[in-house]
Amino acid sequence: MSLLCVRVKRAKFQGSPDKFNTYVTLKVQNVKSTTVAVRGDQPSWEQDFMFEISRLDLGLSVEVWNKGLIWDTMVGTVWIALKTIRQSDEEGPGEWSTLEAETLMKNDEICGTKNPTPHKILLGTRFELPFDIPEEEARYWTYKLEQINALADDNEYSSQEESQRKLLPTAAAQCRHWTYLGWGEHQTFEDPDSAVDDRDSDYRSETSNSAPPPYHTTTQPNASAHQFPMPVPLPQQLFLQGSSRDSCNDSMQSYDLDYPERRALSPTSSSRYGSSCNVSRGSSLLSELDQYHEQDDDGRERDSIHSSHSYGSLSRDGQAGLGEQEKALEVACESQKEKTGESKERDDATVCPPSDLMLHKDLTLGPQESFPEEKASSPFTQARAHWFRAVTKVRLQLQEISDDGDPSLPQWLPEGPAGGLYGIDSMPDLRRKKPLPLVSDLAMSLVQSRKAGITSAMATRTSLKDEDLKSHVYKKTLQALIYPISCTTPHNFEVWSATTPTYCYECEGLLWGLARQGMRCSECGVKCHEKCQDLLNADCLQRAAEKSSKHGAEDRTQNIIMAMKDRMKIRERNKPEIFEVIRDVFTVSKVAHVQQMKTVKQSVLDGTSKWSAKITITVVCAQGLQAKDKTGSSDPYVTVQVGKTKKRTKTIFGNLNPVWEEKFHFECHNSSDRIKVRVWDEDDDIKSRVKQRLKRESDDFLGQTIIEVRTLSGEMDVWYNLEKRTDKSAVSGAIRLQINVEIKGEEKVAPYHVQYTCLHENLFHYLTDIQGSGGVWIPDARGDDAWKVYFDETAQEIVDEFAMRYGIESIYQAMTHFACLSSKYMCPGVPAVMSTLLANINAYYAHTTASTNVSASDRFAASNFGKERFVKLLDQLHNSLRIDLSTYRNNFPAGSPERLQDLKSTVDLLTSITFFRMKVQELQSPPRASQVVKDCVKACLNSTYEYIFNNCHDLYSHQYQLQEQPLEEPGPSIRNLDFWPKLITLIVSIIEEDKNSYTPVLNQFPQELNVGKVSAEVMWHLFAQDMKYALEEHEKDRLCKSADYMNLHFKVKWLHNEYVRELPALQGQVPEYPAWFEQFVLQWLDENEDVSLEFLRGGLERDKRDGFQQTSEHALFSCSVVDVFTQLNQSFEIIRKLECPDPSILAHYMRRFAKTIGKVLIQYADILSKNFPAYCTKERLPCILMNNMQQLRVQLEKMFEAMGGKELDSEAADSLKELQVKLNTVLDELSMVFGNSFQVRIDECVRQMADILGQVRGTGNASPNARASVAQDADSVLRPLMDFLDGNLTLFATVCEKTVLKRVLKELWRVVMNTMERVIVLPPLIDQTGTQLILTAAKELSQLSKLKDHMVREETRNLTPKQCAVLDLALDTVKQYFHAGGNGLKKTFLEKSPDLQSLRYALSLYTQTTDTLIKTFVRSQTAQVHDGKGIRFTANEDIRPEKGAGVDDPVGEVSIQVDLFTHPGTGEHKVTVKVVAANDLKWQTAGMFRPFVEVTMVGPHQSDKKRKFTTKSKSNSWTPKYNETFHFLLGNEEGPEAYELQICVKDYCFAREDRVIGLAVMPLRDVAAKGSCACWCPLGRKIHMDETGMTILRILSQRSNDEVAREFVKLKSESRSIEEGS
């Protein structure tokens, strides 16, 4: 067998880091192990695995897998031949291997790989060397194995030996095989990691990702799904027949608290082969066997036994050698039994290892096992039969020994499932249905570990098995209890006067005074100071007997002895239960017990008369002494006095922590004597010399300790606290003494502290495991010393009397009981007792007094219990507590108040351990108890979550479903979402349990730990990871309905809001869960949009069938509006109830929903707009439809406010605002269509008004009669219009909503005003011919003549002043009518209405002269050509400017020089215009092109002046030069700003009208400031004007008799003619 160590380090993958979540599987020899899964393209595992290899011709297969939601995919594989792996005891840097895609197979076994991939993995592989084997021993075994291999020349086994050499490459490896196969179980006692440490490594790997210690087997927590056991092959089972994994090691598995290097078997190393086995122990035992045989003269026998140590190799002489071998085995077993000196009754199992070794040798490397190619031959050759016979013989011997011994020892059991061999890192396949109830299986392995860990410390403790020690302690206990110190006769002190100088027996001070100096016992005669009488505790009777015996007073002695006898008889009669308990505890037969009682009584009666001892005292050192010198130091020395013999050490100068290391020998013949050890400060000054003359003690006293000789036994290394002699003493510190006592008859016994430990442990074992069936008795004591009560009254008296008799400190008792309880710390009530015990132990060491300056750490180091021993015990306990707290839900069920109380006490105990480490051990920063508990709680929650995740369906159906449900997939699925609501339900039950049951219990750290909140935080964190990953997978396929995702979203939201939102750790953070569902919510919104549109169409269809009926008597709109917004509101309510806490995601939802609203309402509006004209002929229906549109706007505003109003996302808000504007526009358009539908009837009414108005005659004077006449005429004129309006507006006021009514009134007002302007004020425009001619500006020149003819034919229809006054009054009446006393349109709107303004302006223009109108036109029309842009000015005509800006498509350009001169006297203006040239004329013509320029002055007061000049024409020139000058004279009535020059370029045509090429207008106001300038005017196609200009043009067009007016209209109506080629 070889041990293969593999470390999976890290890997490098090609690709996106997001797509990798990988783990590694290792396969070798049918054993498979798996790492944890790690995300990223450069994962780091750093996990160790160990395998036992029996065939080096195989290989290690390494596969890298990528985790998926449903199935995993392989990234690549590597195959490593085992023969190529190096041997080393140190881990190397590892080697990079390229992953390949396929494996090569040969004979159904992998033999290589092919098809490299771009991925790589770093692996460290090696074969382990024997652990910690000394070099000398390695050389010895190398030599031995070479000898054995040299003997293997037998022909029968030559081929097998050759193969064996291949399998055992080095001697070191062979030695390693011996270690693992022969002594694997026993070596675990020297394992560098204890059982609890082993389990803690598991715990660490789960919680802190720390790597397990080297040479250690740790179960991979995440590998269970890929691991499986391999059964033992049949031939191996044959040789395992009758064997057991636990055989032959019960007595070896001892755990003595005095020897902490011994450890119990590691519980996690459940494999037969422990992980950190030390070879040297097994090797030394083998060496002893060799030494035994080397003393034998027979060389063949020695060779034979050496051969038996090999792996199945035989001696040269075949059968004879085999017989020698059998004999050697028997001799070896006998010699081993003799060496240990144990009787057959004790049945020490150390006889077993050699036979066990033989079994395993044959099992592992027998010929049939190691060489499969030999299997074709007979399985039982002659040599193999000899082997089998030898093994069977040894097994039968062991069977007999076992039958004669303790029946509790395990027998050789037949093989079964437990007999299989497992890989070190393998585990059973756990992919099965977990049992119920909740989390019951979660930490079962850890529970078993605990039972096998610290608990085994009690079950296999040395004191329970060491019969010699138990026998001695049994006697000593009887001795202490038959005549206990607590029941001894007290001294009978009387005041006594000394006649000679007498010294106190206690303090050895002089009894000062003339009389009545002290006290004297009348019985035993001891004398002392009055203050010292309480310090004497020796039994007066016994002391008197001893004294009488020494002085020969036989009669008195006999009386005292009889008194003591009587007392012991009374004691035995009154307290028989005490001695019965002692007998039961030590399992002594009644006969032996009676005999032993007699012996003990006699030893008490003998007292010290027959007692003697040799005492060796080594004064080692002291710590923390008082400083007595002025220098702040002392010069200490020690005096030791036994009886009357006194000795002293040398002086150590200037040291408060002196080291003496001086040894003194004493003989003592009185067991009641005391050893007085006193520490002094040596003074050598004058004062001390004077004191030396006067006093016995001239030096300063530093402290003392008084030791009862009867409390000593064996070898002791003890720290004693220095104590005061009087109240005035200033004492501190402790002294270390090594005391060796050889009591006559008890030369080889353990110290009393060890004996007390034996008594306490055996008593605890008896009361707990035997009498209490595993339960621990909890004392019900009260008071300050209640913590010192460990057992019931009888057992407590036993330990107290023993401690009192033999000087066992109470703190040692407490620590011993604490150690015992640590093996039962999970029993009900025990944690509370342990917590109290440890708190008092802490108080003892940590709470220093004013009289001592020794630190707590030093005081603890001086503990007789052993510092390392107690610290190791606490470390083990601390680890076990962490593991149990990491499964608190299983170990401390919420339904058990008693266990919850134990949980609280367990945390208190953990806190006490932390206090101990901080205050007693004085560690700098021990782990805080609160943090440890918090980590444990998190670890438990992690495990709990994993459990409920893996068993979700089973747990849910068990707890929440009464009826049987069909089988479902065990985990999450992409086909449905059923798994997640169930998981949420289970998570809530866990959090509620933690909040309600565990939080009130684990309340020791209110500021740092709240279990309910931690539970919610951990559960949410783990749930969030899985939920996010699952939804990412769902997003790819989306196999579920969007409604299902929305329902799950609501459940997740509820979970977060209910339990997570208020957690301190998550305060101020935006939750992540809305992001997981964002795409699904948007999908739902997309689908919801289609649903809303369907609702819209359906609602409109129903509305249409019903004739758009009002929804109610008071509602003015129809049902379709209600239908549309019912659906939209329901949809928004769902979005609102999501309560999305992420503003950005909520903004996405709002934007998307705003689009839905917009799409639905716009489609509604489009449908109404499309069908609206068809309904305008009906009276009420158009009003209801407009009401519907208005109601859409009202509901949209409400929805806008519901969606957040001003707080709404800006993009969504802008979208809704834009929608509101669109709806408003639609309503305006509907109102306009509705208003225009009345155009024909209003035209008819207005024509009737015009006819009536045309009949009005008279002047417009201001007399009262005239005013009355005007009012009467106005009423007559309005009557046709008012009759029409009365009927309709009354209906509108009833049917329309107020907003709609105002819009309808506005449209009617517009139509009435425009019609009155068009029909009455500007009647020629009614003629479409005239209108067309004016508006199109006579595109053809021929049409100009038609316009003239038309204007001539049209009769003049100028309104008279009276008619204007009537019409103006009629307008006021109409205005009042539309205002309707405040119920209609506002007066402000009516007054500022552009339609009324236009009408009134037209009326006002009617009364103005032609000059005034022309002046108004020039001043108001500033953008007639090219929007008034493009004219450039230069200083003179020779400087041509850049092209004008803002001019699109000019048809040419004219250059003119303008000079403006104003006469200083008359104020008249003279304008000189020089037409320089025309440039870039754009004109196409087939014939002659003769352009010329026409310049016209436009303005008032020009009727008597020349207004127009024309240049000569230039033939066929598109850039003609003219250089012609013209002069215009202007009056002084107006300034230059009332005039403008209009330049028109025309093509001269003979016999027909000239054609216009382009026009330009230059206002003189631009020249006025300059006076003189060169102008460059771009030519436009026609004159543009606004409404004012058009109105003036219309009015002037009616003045056909006014030449200036006609010329002006013609001038402004001209436009570019159609080109011949276009």
From Swiss-Prot:
Residues 189-280, 292-357 are annotated as: Disordered. Residues 1210-1231 form a coiled coil. Ca(2+) 1 binds at D629, D635, D681, D683. The modification Phosphoserine is found at S16, S307, S378. Pfam families: C1_1, C2, MUN. Residues 206-225, 238-254, 266-280 have a biased composition (Polar residues). Ca(2+) 2 binds at D629, D681, D683, D700. The keyword RNA-binding does not apply. GO terms for cellular component: calyx of Held; cytosol; early phagosome; glutamatergic synapse; Golgi apparatus; hippocampal mossy fiber to CA3 synapse; membrane; neuromuscular junction. Residues 196-205, 292-306, 324-349 have a biased composition (Basic and acidic residues). GO terms for molecular function: calcium ion binding; calmodulin binding; diacylglycerol binding; GTP-dependent protein binding; phospholipid binding; syntaxin binding; syntaxin-1 binding; zinc ion binding. It comes from the Eukaryota. Residues 1275-1417 form the MHD2 domain. GO terms for biological process: acrosomal vesicle exocytosis; cellular response to glucose stimulus; chemical synaptic transmission; dense core granule priming; innervation; negative regulation of synaptic plasticity; neuromuscular junction development; neuronal dense core vesicle exocytosis. Plays a role in vesicle maturation during exocytosis as a target of the diacylglycerol second messenger pathway. Is involved in neurotransmitter release by acting in synaptic vesicle priming prior to vesicle fusion and participates in the activity-depending refilling of readily releasable vesicle pool (RRP). Essential for synaptic vesicle maturation in a subset of excitatory/glutamatergic but not inhibitory/GABA-mediated synapses. In collaboration with UNC13A, facilitates neuronal dense core vesicles fusion as well as controls the location and efficiency of their synaptic release. Interacts with RIMS1. Belongs to the unc-13 family. This is Protein unc-13 homolog B.
